[in-house]
Amino acid sequence: MRSRRLLSAAHLLCLCAVALAAPGSRFLVTAPGIIRPGANVTIGVDLLENSPPQVLVKAQVFKIASNKSRSILEAEGVFHRGHFKTLVLPALPLSSADKIYELHINGQSENEIVFSNRTRLTFESKSISVLIQTDKAFYKPKQEVKFRVLTLCSDLKPYRTSVDIFIKDPKSNVIQQWFSQKGDLGVVSKTFQLSSNPIFGDWSIQVQVNDQQYYQSFQVLEYVLPKFEVTVQTPLYCSLKSKQLNGSVIAKYTYGKPVKGSLSLTFLPLSFWGKKKNITKSFEINGFANFSFDNYEMKKVMNLKPLTDVSEGSYENVDPSFPGPAEIIATVTESLTGISRMASTNVFFKQHDYIIEIFDYTTVLKPSLNFTATVKVSRSDGNQLTPEEIENDLVTVVTQRKNNHPESQRDQEMDYIQTVNYTIPQNGIIKIEFPVMSISGELQLKAYFLDGTSSVTVHSMFTSPSKTYIQLKTRDEYIKVGSPFDLMVSGNRQFKDLSYMVISKGQLVAAGKQSSRTFSLTPEASWAPKACIIAYYIAEDGEIINDILKIPVQLVFENKVKLFWSKPTVKPSDKVSLRISATQSDSLVGIVAVDKSVTLMENSNSITMETMVHELELYNTEYYLGMFMNSFAVFQECGLWVLTDATLIRDSIDEVYDTEEYSERFAEENEANLVDFEDASSVNNVHVRKNFPETWIWLDAYMGSKIYEEFEVTVPDSITSWVASAFVISEDLGFGLTTVPAELQAFQPFFLFLNLPYSVIRGEEFALEVSIVNYLKDTIKVVILIEESDSFDILMTSNDTNGTIYRKTVQVPRDNGVTLVFPIKPTHLGEIPITVTAASPTASDAVTQTIVVKPEGIEKSYSKSVLLDLTDSNVESKQQSMRFSFPPDTVIGSERVQITAIGDILGSSINGLSSLIRMPYGCGEQNMIYFAPNIYILDYLTKQKQLTVNLKEKALSYMRQGYQRELLYQREDGSFSAFGDIDSSGSTWLSAFVLRCFLEADYYIDIDQDVLHRTYTWLNAHKKFNGEFWEPGRVIHSELQGGTKSPVTLTAYIVTSVLGYKKYQPNIDVQDSIKFLEFEFSRGISDNYTLAIISYALSTVGSPKAEEALNLLMQRSEKEGDTQFWLSSGPALSGSWQPRSVDIEIAAYALLAHTLHHVSEGIPVMRWLIQQRNSLGGFVSTQDTVVALKALSEFSALVHKENTDIQLTVTGPGIPRSIHFRIDSQNLFLLHQEELHALDPITVNVSAHGSGFAICQLNVDYNVKGSGSSKRRRSTENQEVFDLDVIVNNEDDISHLNLNVCTSHLGSERTGMVLMEVNLLSGFSASSDSIPLSETLKKVEYDNGKLNLYLDSVNESQFCVNIPTVRDYKVSNIRDGSVSVMDYYEPRRQAVRSYNTQVKLSSCYLSPDTNCKSHTDGATDSLRRSSSLLVFCSVLLYFVQH
């Protein structure tokens, strides 16, 4: 309840002497007790019969500040005796602030001041409505959030203003923001892209308007849309005397058809005491099933015991004496797919069979007027009353007593008791009305029906010195805007005229006089959703006699919008028209259509009628105490201030509160356009279904001069129902809403779906399961046809007698489904599409899905780049050669060779922004490879004036997604660590890295400044007095851990990061850290990595030691041809064409230092770096890729040359015709590429003519065989740095396989972060949730047949992990899987082992009809389409099987 400062009567009336001397009552003035920006202040003026004939009324609103008042609103008008009219003051501006406001009002006739007073108005900040609509309430990673912001005035007219919008993740970090957004008619539409790995939980859209905050939440989580809905129907109440509890379960697909399957039903008591017990039953279900639990079953699990009369079914509870509710849980499992869905409901237990409810009864007694109430009789089991039960009467006993008599003094003479019987109608609702005795001070109503009983008691008495009362009521139960309703006024005295007023949302919205005791009013839109009606008259003695009636008013929008589909039912991929009908032209219609499966997930962020009613109720300021016991309280109950010279009665307690045309036409068209699913379909022109969105339509439609619009759209391929809704908004009529969503059923009564693995390895065979569903009227004969392809063969099984290998015929019963199996053997590598068609004389369907076929063995890659520099005017041509030989264990057919050329140093990295390296990046540092390179690319292209709109949007999208993901790893203290809050501490190295990247990105995307500040503050707290930074957490980058110089390296790294924070905190001082670095440099730095970072750090601050450090670094470099680089010492590593990751970082830091000193001397370093790039545009690992791209982008901007025009010619033994690439200023960033024949060895000759420079790169991908030695604990081929052992456990289990993987480091020191990659066997899957995390194992990711396990570090102690896997698909002749362990920041430090299942499937197991006698590997024959071969193989199979 709001506190109101309404002035008491003593303070209220300040009337002049003339007014006080005047005989009789002359005026009654009312005004709202509040003032609201945007809303008029409406004053009611009723000049009574003793008033002067004409009064000039003037009202002003003053704003008071610093003891000074200023008039800001005013109005005046002439009022006449005997009339009740209103005076309307203009509204406060919507931007008004919460200040002190006073209303001054005075009335003047020719000769006198009739009245004059003032009152303080309470400021109500709720002045506008801001609605935030999203297309859904739930989102998956990588999905797009579509949302609208609507700003409306309190009358639902558009409010044109600018809004600020913020997207916040569950940690309240600002992920994206838009400032000063304005939209047409107050509607702003935006979209927001979620990253592939966002923080799960409740996200929010925050909108700021006029310093007010508005929110809408949405959830981000992993989910699968339900394809069918389960509902449980039970009565809300059940009598303990009932013989049983009955209910039903309904299971329907979103397209309306029944679900066939099994039903598990559980009765679970929800009491808080005793041992939990339940009842579980199982049934078959075909869309509907009835169930019952008898009283004996329920008694057992609810701890009930029979009373003496067991036959009556009465029970008492053991402890306590009355049972709590029970939950009924229904789980339906679809027979065709095995998918389950659950629903539940609660049942409350009553001690009686019948429930009596008394409501809408009089709460304040008015003697001699009627007491009214509504009584409802119902069965506790929810069933209708039977004709036999209705023959019994409802018995009411009314007891009326005198007031102020304690119980001990009461006797029956003081009580008036009356018993009345009522006949019960079919609906069980009875209206009761009887007079209140003149002596009554208390009234009790008791109602009885069979064993049910209920009662209410009313103690409150209306206060009137003259005992004069009126009663205001209506018989209309449903009152809505625009429809008249009747009001009846009864009283115990005669009266002539009656005044009335209507108040809603704190404002006086209607007023007038009536001479009849029955009159009608027509609600306007301003009345909704609740209105408070006051009726009154002035008695002869001057007393105000009044009453109040509160009514709900159903909201009816003046601006109407309707959506219609041109057809109610369509087939997937059909064309259909969405038709829009609006009331007014120049309207904006916002439409959303979503899969009905989305609506089954309970929550919704749609704008509905309930949304609007709730929104409008927020404007209401009435007290709603329900205890208006005198004439003053009646006005107060509706939030009114009253000024009158009539008698206004109040109690002492009151002092406390002083502070359709289109629908018919479309319906006809819909009837004519019903889809006839029995029509014959053309098998030769079957649409293949591929498009399955969750949100189909999100459209802002501008109607222009029309009130009718039609859009043709293509129905997606989902077999479901689509639910479309819309709102409309226009300048004059404001907001409107579709009252009923337009539902479109996208359904075909005959369809198929495929079940196949995501990928297999060449040489493996798999079972393609084809399920056909038939909802036609009859059983049909269906031909299943696999589209022939050179990419796979179909294996013949012994029982294939009803068709050929590509074609089968099957009978599919009506309202049922059948599954067929086709054994498939892929023959080509890559993505293989499989198209299946199901055809019958009456219907057909086709579906295409792809399967990825990978080569066997372990993936390897090689890249070689050459820089063709023709920038010297004296050089017109250059030639370069590149060579590669495949190792002897290369898998035949896995080889892929490609030549690329591009005209810009960063060109290949720009083209590969989405995936720069071949490693997963699932921790806080590695994620930044998805973020940081985009900054450097944008910087570089902006400087070169080569930034295109498409590339900018692409880079910004990657950055926003990377930013979202990175915030997963921010800890509560503001620091960042590899795995966020699960780590024991934040990392200064990683926090500095993230801070630097966020500061660099702040120019392009929205970065929450609070995130930056918290990170910087945490970093600064980890600096020692001498300027040295220290690392409290684990250092996952191996080059930064251990050794005497690691604090020096860390400090240099952090200095380069925190300097960027100067734009937010200009007084940052890093001189102590610089002096620390200079001192350590003067002592000597033997490590090249540390020296490189120090050189860069000292260069960024202009240290006098910077050039000396850089010179020393260059002296230690290696030179080869026109390149310059560094080689770090270290243990022997697994073979790789790329250098160590640390060597790339050293070169990158040296190049960054050269951007500040002696630019030309850095060109040889740049050339070397370019040559180390992989085919994706990145380098070895994440950190080296980020630093190298930063260095190349900044350095290239300094040495970039204009006017490139180069002709490249590529020749070689495997190139029958020369390949020509033309690179000029118009296509510098175009990646030219050609596939080459994979000859061994590969020799590629490149010649360049012209001017400028180009980069040519040879990329080779291939697989090597997993040799037998790789299965042993350790390879003798390479000096591995990890010991790795893989043990397979599944001796007798065909469906499960457990891997036990153990590893340790073959060295005394602890490693940095280690990545374990487990390539699963084809057909098997593993859940990342089934592998528990530990201090060593920090994260597990599942990625399309592969598990990535992130280990914090590995030492000499063995670390083991158990990986349970499950067979999801039947795959025979399974090839080896592999397990690898590698140092993430030095991937050449690795070990690889292969493994396989001990229980292998032969091809005969792929068909369910085949009797397989052996579970060892069997040979399979791939049968071609040749008829002779088919006969031969059939004979061969016959002899083999016999």
Curated annotation (Swiss-Prot):
Disulfide bonds: none annotated. GO terms for biological process: hair follicle development; keratinocyte proliferation; negative regulation of keratinocyte proliferation; negative regulation of stem cell proliferation; negative regulation of transforming growth factor beta receptor signaling pathway; negative regulation of wound healing; osteoclast fusion; regulation of keratinocyte differentiation. It comes from the Eukaryota. Its main location: membrane. There is a cross-link at C923-Q926 (Isoglutamyl cysteine thioester (Cys-Gln)). It is a lipid-anchor; GPI-anchor. Keywords: Bait region, Cell membrane, Disulfide bond, Glycoprotein, GPI-anchor, Lipoprotein, Membrane, Protease inhibitor, Serine protease inhibitor, Signal, Thioester bond. Residues 1420-1442 form a propeptide. GO terms for cellular component: cytosol; extracellular space; plasma membrane; side of membrane. Pfam families: A2M (PF00207), A2M_BRD (PF07703), A2M_recep (PF07677), MG2 (PF01835), MG3 (PF17791), TED_complement (PF07678). Glycans are attached at N67, N117, N246, N278, N370, N421, N1088. The keyword Glycoprotein applies. N-glycosylated. A lipid is attached at A1419 (GPI-anchor amidated alanine). Residues 1-21 form the signal peptide. Residues 595-704 are annotated as: Bait region (approximate). GO terms for molecular function: serine-type endopeptidase inhibitor activity. It is found in: Cell membrane. Belongs to the protease inhibitor I39 (alpha-2-macroglobulin) family. Heterodimer; disulfide-linked. Interacts with TGFB1 and TGFBR1. Forms a heteromeric complex with TGFBR1, TGFBR2 and TGFBR3 in a ligand-independent manner. Modulates negatively TGFB1 signaling in keratinocytes. This is CD109 antigen.
